[in-house]
């Protein structure tokens, strides 16, 4: 499991690579946030229920519906409309999800060559977009109504992008360069 790998191999390796004197200075993954945005389709209760069901299957815990903060006429949404759902994973469920993401989902993604350094936000957090949520094995292709996209944000306590990239490479994330 990735949690055991982190404690036994990744922490000592990063401690020497980054030149830290204390184990607590080594960066770690704090949480993983999953989000499915539906936009105008969120007002359809059937689509919204399938979104919540699918995200619950992917994450292993119940997601929370997200609502529009303000009305935007160009997007045809009003304040309070449901526009998607999200879930935050921590601890054991986070590590289980990351293991499935690295070893199953990313290799199954179409035209996937690897993650880019440009996907970091400058503070050590990585954002990944999955075009088709059916890449997850938990989703039964026959039971879905629409193929949805999925946003994955991996939040670390790394000081900069380079430390976060080293951390994620130790976990086995495939980077292009």
Swiss-Prot record:
GO terms for molecular function: rRNA binding; structural constituent of ribosome; tRNA binding. SUPFAM superfamilies: RL5-like. GO terms for biological process: translation. GO terms for cellular component: ribonucleoprotein complex; ribosome. It comes from the Bacteria. PROSITE patterns: RIBOSOMAL_L5. Gene3D superfamilies: 3.30.1440.10. Keywords: Ribonucleoprotein, Ribosomal protein, RNA-binding, rRNA-binding, tRNA-binding. InterPro entries: Ribosomal_uL5, Ribosomal_uL5_bac-type, Ribosomal_uL5_C, Ribosomal_uL5_CS, Ribosomal_uL5_dom_sf, Ribosomal_uL5_N. The keyword Transport does not apply. Part of the 50S ribosomal subunit; part of the 5S rRNA/L5/L18/L25 subcomplex. Contacts the 5S rRNA and the P site tRNA. Forms a bridge to the 30S subunit in the 70S ribosome. This is one of the proteins that bind and probably mediate the attachment of the 5S RNA into the large ribosomal subunit, where it forms part of the central protuberance. In the 70S ribosome it contacts protein S13 of the 30S subunit (bridge B1b), connecting the 2 subunits; this bridge is implicated in subunit movement. Contacts the P site tRNA; the 5S rRNA and some of its associated proteins might help stabilize positioning of ribosome-bound tRNAs. HAMAP family: Ribosomal_uL5_B (MF_01333_B). This is Large ribosomal subunit protein uL5. It comes from Ehrlichia canis (strain Jake).
């Amino acid at each position: 499991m990735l949690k055991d790998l982190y404690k036994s191999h990744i922490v000592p390796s990063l401690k020497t690579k980054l030149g830290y004197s204390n184990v607590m200075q080594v960066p770690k993954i704090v949480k993983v946030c999953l989000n499915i945005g539906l936009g105008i389709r969120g007002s359809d209760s059937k689509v919204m229920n399938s979104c919540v069901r699918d995200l619950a299957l992917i994450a292993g815990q119940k997601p929370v519906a997200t609502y529009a903060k303000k009305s935007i006429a160009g997007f045809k949404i009003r304040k309070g409309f449901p526009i998607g759902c999200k879930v935050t994973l921590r601890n054991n469920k986070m590590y289980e999800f990351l293991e499935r993401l690295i070893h199953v989902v990313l290799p199954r993604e179409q035209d996937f060559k690897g993650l880019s350094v440009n996907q970091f936000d400058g503070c050590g957090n990585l954002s990944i977009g999955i075009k088709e949520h059916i890449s997850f094995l938990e989703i039964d292709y026959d039971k879905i109504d629409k193929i949805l996209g999925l946003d994955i944000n991996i939040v670390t306590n790394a000081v900069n992008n380079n430390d976060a990239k080293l951390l994620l490479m130790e976990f086995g994330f495939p980077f292009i360069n």
